[in-house]
A protein has these predicted regions:
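Beta-rich ligand-binding surfaces for carbohydrates and other polyanions
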Residues: 2-373
Length: 373
């Protein structure tokens, strides 16, 4: 037993010294045990099962090491129902599969090229990759972003980020960020047509006569349009709004012994934000919101949900219900309002008319292209 422990310790130390830890075919994780993830060499990133709301999901996250909450970076099959506590994840020749006691095996991460998987790694870049027997990457999570990109990751032309439904539900939410073929970076409500009338923010990065461009968040937290052919920087994208915690981040950054990981996320509220995650020497990390696309969140179409309106005071958005309605959930004011009275029908066009009235509200700006129901 002592020899086995020593060998495991030796493997762990060698893994940390390398740029990746190789996960062999047949390796598995179980949600019912303490081994629920595979970590990167630095242990800053992990891939495996994570808890969210009332279920389990498979994804990649920044590991808070028990000192801070984990920051989820990517979720696999985000719109599928969550797994139960008896799920098992395994790497085999077709990729990563997940099985449970209540359903048959399913392919969770497939190889688009139908190449045979041979091994996998959770890299220190935050990229989970699958290799073939020639050690070539045949699948990587960086090519399938959900709502976040990391420093060193790119968003290709006509690709998108989609916000999560809520902080406790990683399924697709209400907004998406598109890297359009014309080079522009644009925010739209997800359930509307992508057109100039429905867009609520754009980076003004139109490009003419230049193809093969991608949006890249570099390792120092700068968003850039990159030429995919020669990796040259075509244009830098600036998020104009400086967040309140920006000055705190600058103070923290002055300590050179701390390492920083940058991320850019389309958050639940529809705003696109740049974050810095500063790792502490004793483990864990501190997250700072640095910049965002919009100063006024009320400009985000549908920010307050159905039957409600948004006001912006003291640099903060506030949602309020239209007369005759109350919040669907008082603890989540952004999901909208519902009628607070019993419906009365106007039979023959006359009955119950006294129960209805039309009320005018002053100072309301109707947002073109988004219809309340």
């Amino acid at each position: 037993m002592a020899l086995l422990s020593a060998l495991l310790l030796l493997f762990s130390s060698l893994c940390v010294q390398q740029s990746s830890c190789i996960i062999p075919l047949g390796a598995s994780l179980s949600s019912a045990t303490q081994t629920t993830s595979w970590t990167s060499p630095s242990r800053r990133f992990a891939f495996g099962f994570y808890n969210r709301g009332n279920g389990l999901y498979v994804g990649v996250w920044l590991d808070g090491n028990g000192k801070k909450a984990n920051k989820v970076i990517w979720t696999a099959k985000r719109d599928d129902r969550p797994f139960t506590s008896d799920a098992t994840l395994k790497l085999n020749e077709i990729g990563v599969i997940v099985s449970t006691a209540e359903c048959r095996e399913m392919i969770f991460i497939a190889n688009e090229n139908h190449s045979d998987a041979y091994s996998a790694s959770m890299l220190d870049s935050g990229n989970f990759v699958i290799y073939n027997k020639d050690n070539h990457i045949i699948w990587e999570s960086f090519q399938h972003p959900t709502d976040t990109i990391l420093g060193g990751q790119s968003l290709l032309a006509n690709s998108q980020l989609i916000s999560s439904l809520s902080e406790n539900d990683p399924s697709a939410g209400m907004y998406h960020l598109r890297r359009q073929n014309d080079g522009n970076l644009v925010l739209y409500p997800l359930e509307s047509e992508d057109s100039p009338t429905t867009a609520y923010w754009k980076a003004e990065t139109y490009v003419t006569n230049v193809a093969n461009l991608s949006l890249r968040l570099n390792s120092t937290g700068v968003l850039q349009l990159i030429n995919n052919i020669d990796s040259s920087v075509y244009r830098t994208i600036h998020l104009s709004n400086q967040e309140e915690s920006y000055s705190d981040f600058n103070e923290s950054r002055s300590n050179n012994s701390k390492s920083i990981v940058y991320s850019a996320s389309l958050d639940v509220d529809g705003n696109f934000r740049l974050y810095a995650h500063v790792f502490e020497p004793n483990g864990g990390f501190q997250t700072y919101a640095m910049r965002s696309a919009l100063v006024n969140s009320c400009k985000i179409k549908g920010f307050c949900g159905f039957n409600s309106y948004c006001t912006f005071n003291d640099n903060r958005p506030f949602c309020a219900c239209l007369p005759g309605t109350d919040f669907i959930d008082p603890n989540q004011n952004t999901i909208g309002c519902k009628r607070n009275y019993s419906e009365a029908h106007c039979k023959g066009g006359k009955a119950n008319i006294p129960l209805y009235n039309i009320t005018s509200m002053q100072g309301i700006e109707w947002t073109t292209g988004y219809i309340l129901q």
